[in-house]
């Protein structure tokens, strides 16, 4: 595909990195010549220096014959204008835009539709991150929770702990422990390295285990890998920006929520907007404030300011003072690997959430959902099996007979309303939704090719 990426920031650059190795023709546009030079030195792509929404710049980038335009500059207005220009002047067929402002998002149904601003797919990072954190709170102890096929099946990452019934046992014992629940371990990472899960594989404490199950069975499977934690009740949020405010609004009906905001005017506004959240104006690094608000009784402390260092330090302080779990929002990708797994329980990257959403729209038509995992090194993919036995490499074939790319595991199949956990004898049928885990994202193009029907396939 010929894809134009507008914006060479962290998201634009990471998206280009993901797509360049998949036989795509990538052009990236930005007004920062140094950043463009840096990307061109690293990857096989074209660059255009200029303003992303200007017609002459888009023409130079090849909007007239591009398959897709992805607008991820730092300003919503530029992204919207670029989509409008690409549609009106160049008839670029697929247009994706990142929009952050809650004022635009509040009117998205009216603004982004046929006959209005021509954005085919809207990416709202703050909404994605809010939903992601909400899922983690719903499943105490989970490191990642990703849902597929309209929430019917989920891929969950947990850390195996001493005391979990399966820890120290082989994977084959999973069915003995849960005879009425079907699940599949898609991957195990031990000390950061992937292990191919087999029936004889012994689960060790501190293993990062990715399993696939019907969404209503997640808690049961988690209880086999770690001591099942009690549902969270008390939550403290630091930072009353878009994400913090949105998260508090979603949680306040079912949890006891406190929010700390440093800016007095913002705190005052939030106290009026939020019905059941207690809002404080103060510094989350203030030990006296945390002590007064009973930090030792908090189930989850979530730091969501715009400053990585503030989030990390306040979370470390909260953990030391007794908070049971701490989560932090991290903008810099390099920090995520450094902090998660120690004092910090979960590090959340808005860039990875955005990349996952973008890849879902950029992948070929048979790929309907993508989640970037393990800080972008791995991926979970939902693909639809199209074609028949004469045109497809997967339809009508048992999973054990399909030659999958290295490190690829089929975890589940969703057939209509039915969730089928994948086993070697499971046969894929036309229109099945197939959920896969890829230990290494470099094999994504091989998976795409596997699911593309071909009239020449015999």
Curated annotation (Swiss-Prot):
Main location: membrane
Membrane topology category: Peripheral membrane protein
Disulphide bridges: none
Alphabetical keyword list: Cell inner membrane, Cell membrane, Ion transport, Membrane, NAD, Potassium, Potassium transport, Repeat, Transport
Domain RCK C-terminal, chain residue ranges per copy: 143-227, 368-453
PANTHER family: POTASSIUM CHANNEL PROTEIN 2-RELATED-RELATED (PTHR43833), TRK SYSTEM POTASSIUM UPTAKE PROTEIN TRKA (PTHR43833:SF5)
NCBIfam families given in the database record: PRK09496.1-1, PRK09496.1-2, PRK09496.1-4, PRK09496.3-2
Domain notes from UniProt: The RCK N-terminal domain binds NAD and possibly other effectors. This is expected to cause a conformation change that regulates potassium transport.
Entry protein name: Trk system potassium uptake protein TrkA
Organism: Vibrio alginolyticus
């Amino acid at each position: 595909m010929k894809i134009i990426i507008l914006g060479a920031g962290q998201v634009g650059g990471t998206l280009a990195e993901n797509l360049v190795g998949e036989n795509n023709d990538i052009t990236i546009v930005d007004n920062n010549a140094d950043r463009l030079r840096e990307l061109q030195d690293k990857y096989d792509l074209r660059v255009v220096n200029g303003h992303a929404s200007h017609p002459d710049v888009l023409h130079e980038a090849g909007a007239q014959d591009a398959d897709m335009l992805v607008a991820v500059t730092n300003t919503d207005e530029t992204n919207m204008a670029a989509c409008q220009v690409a549609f009106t002047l160049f008839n670029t067929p697929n247009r994706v835009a990142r929009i952050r402002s809650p004022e635009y998002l509040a009117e998205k149904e009216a603004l982004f539709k046929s006959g209005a601003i021509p954005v085919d797919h809207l990416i709202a990072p703050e909404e994605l991150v809010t939903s992601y954190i909400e899922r983690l709170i719903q499943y105490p102890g989970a490191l990642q929770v990703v849902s597929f096929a309209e929430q019917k099946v989920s891929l969950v990452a947990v850390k195996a702990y001493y005391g979990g019934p399966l820890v120290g046992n082989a994977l084959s014992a999973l069915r003995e422990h849960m005879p009425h629940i079907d699940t599949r371990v898609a991957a195990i990472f031990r000390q950061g390295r992937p292990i191919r899960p087999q029936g004889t594989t012994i689960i060790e404490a501190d293993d990062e285990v990715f399993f696939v199950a019907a969404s209503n069975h997640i808690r049961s499977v988690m209880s086999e890998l770690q001591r099942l934690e009690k549902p969270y009740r008390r939550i403290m949020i630091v930072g009353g920006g878009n994400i913090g405010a949105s998260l508090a609004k979603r949680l306040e009906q079912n949890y006891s929520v406190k929010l700390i905001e440093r800016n007095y005017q913002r705190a005052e506004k939030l106290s009026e907007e939020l019905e059941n959240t207690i809002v404080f104006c103060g510094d989350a690094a203030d030990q006296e404030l945390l002590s007064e608000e009973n930090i030792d009784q908090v189930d989850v402390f979530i730091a969501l300011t715009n400053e990585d260092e503030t989030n990390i330090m306040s979370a470390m302080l909260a953990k030391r003072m007794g908070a049971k779990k701490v989560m932090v929002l991290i903008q810099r990708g390099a920090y995520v690997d450094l902090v998660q797994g120690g004092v910090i329980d979960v590090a959340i990257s808005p860039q990875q959430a955005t990349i996952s959403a973008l890849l879902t729209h950029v992948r070929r038509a048979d790929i309907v959902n993508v989640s970037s995992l393990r800080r972008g090194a791995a991926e979970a993919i939902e693909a639809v099996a199209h074609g028949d036995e004469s045109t497809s490499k997967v339809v009508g074939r048992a999973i054990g007979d399909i030659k999958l790319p290295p490190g690829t595991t089929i975890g589940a199949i969703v057939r209509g309303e039915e969730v089928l956990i994948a086993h070697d004898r499971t046969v894929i049928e036309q229109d099945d939704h197939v959920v896969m885990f890829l230990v290494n994202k470099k094999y994504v193009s091989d998976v795409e090719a596997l699911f593309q029907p071909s009239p020449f396939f015999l």
